[in-house]
Swiss-Prot record:
Name of the protein in its database record: Malate dehydrogenase
MF GO annotations: L-lactate dehydrogenase activity; L-malate dehydrogenase (NAD+) activity
Keywords per UniProt: NAD, Oxidoreductase, Tricarboxylic acid cycle
Gene name linked to the record: mdh
Pfam families referenced in this protein's UniProt entry, alphabetically: Ldh_1_C, Ldh_1_N
Listed InterPro entries: L-lactate/malate_DH (IPR001557), Lactate/malate_DH_C (IPR022383), Lactate/malate_DH_N (IPR001236), Lactate_DH/Glyco_Ohase_4_C (IPR015955), Malate_DH_type3 (IPR011275), NAD(P)-bd_dom_sf (IPR036291)
Enzyme class name: oxidoreductase
Keyword GTP-binding on entry: no
Family statement: Belongs to the LDH/MDH superfamily. MDH type 3 family.
Protein residues bound to NAD(+): G12, A13, G14, N15, I16, G17, D36, N98, V121, T122, N123
SUPFAM superfamilies xrefs: LDH C-terminal domain-like, NAD(P)-binding Rossmann-fold domains
Enzyme Commission numbers on file: 1.1.1.37
Record-annotated active site: H178 (proton acceptor)
């Protein structure tokens, strides 16, 4: 007997939503509901992707819709709805507009798919996860924000590029909010198992250059927004969300930095912020508390304060 395919709903059919739908189809992770308020956009993108299925050898169903009823009984939901950044805008500038959208999305998740695992991508990320959480009444382990995976990927790529080595050999991660106060942890970065701090001591790269990479990581999203001049990044954000989705659907129990709910971990309560988590079949199965030096702790708590302030503005 053939196992029933998972149902994955994508709320928002913009650049990230469309890219997600195609990536899910290529990996055959499940059937897709592509939902958007714009009539014709999700239907057109769904048809375009499914017309590529004979070439891609993908046997999943992709349905475009404008009706929230169609997300009923989803196994997983990825939210990308809302307006994107434009040059000169910060992620925080999106707050009021996107908060209203997230409230509506959360209420419909509560109504139609209260048992789904939910990944929020919409910016300003940490605040938007909180809005969806409150309006959906989801358990804290079943909702996360996609930020740390993306920020960590940028950090890893910039290091690999500067060192002229394979990205596969670079391990690094970023804590804190998805914004200017994020904390790329140099002390936990390594190259093929060799701590980055030792690579610096060897003279392969200078600490000054690493600090430049840290700053470039913090401004990674802005760099792309400025280059595109209309819209924001979507390939890397989509890939990041897929890694989280796949870890949940396949119970991979990968350690991934996500905006997760803290209930005392790191001395923080009742806040979603980027920390290392284990994602498996039960959603966020564990929050890992890593030790930080005084400087890193100071930066992390500065990030916590920035996220709290943003959440209070909403």
């Amino acid at each position: 007997m053939t196992a029933q395919r998972k149902k994955i709903s994508l709320i928002g059919a913009g650049n990230i939503g469309g890219t997600l739908a195609h990536m899910i189809a290529l990996r055959e992770l499940g059937d897709v509901i592509l939902l958007d308020v714009s009539d014709g956009i999700p239907q057109g993108k769904a048809l375009d992707i499914t017309e590529s299925s004979p070439i891609d050898r993908s046997n999943v169903n992709i349905t475009g819709t404008n009706r929230y009823e169609d997300i009923k009984n989803s196994d997983a939901i990825i939210i990308t709805a809302g307006i994107a950044r434009k040059p000169g805008m910060s992620r925080d500038d999106l707050l009021q507009t996107n908060a209203a959208v997230m409230k509506e999305v959360g209420e419909n998740i509560k109504k139609h798919s209260p048992n789904a695992f939910v990944i929020v991508v919409t910016n300003p990320l940490d605040a938007m996860v909180s809005v969806v959480y409150k309006s959906s009444s989801l358990p804290t382990n079943m909702i996360v924000g996609m930020a740390g995976v993306l920020d960590s990927a940028r950090f890893r790529y910039f290091l690999a590029s500067e060192l002229n080595i394979s990205v596969e050999d670079v391990s690094a991660f970023v804590l804190g909010g998805h914004g200017d106060t994020m904390v790329p942890l140099i002390n936990y970065a390594s190259i093929a198992g060799i701590p980055l701090t030792q690579i610096i001591e060897m003279g392969v790269i200078t600490r000054g250059k690493v600090d430049e990479i840290v700053e470039r990581t913090r401004n990674g999203g802005k760099e792309i927004v400025d280059l595109l001049k209309s819209g924001s990044a979507y390939y890397a954000p989509a890939s990041s969300a897929i890694s989280m989705l796949e870890s949940y659907l396949k119970d991979k129990r990968r350690i991934l930095p996500c905006a997760a709910y803290l209930n005392g971990e790191y001395g923080v309560k009742d806040l979603f912020i980027g920390v290392p988590t284990i994602i498996g079949k039960n959603g966020v199965e564990k929050v890992l508390e890593v030790k930080m030096n005084d400087s890193e702790q100071e930066m992390f708590y500065k990030s916590v304060s920035a996220v709290k302030e943003l959440c209070q503005l909403n």
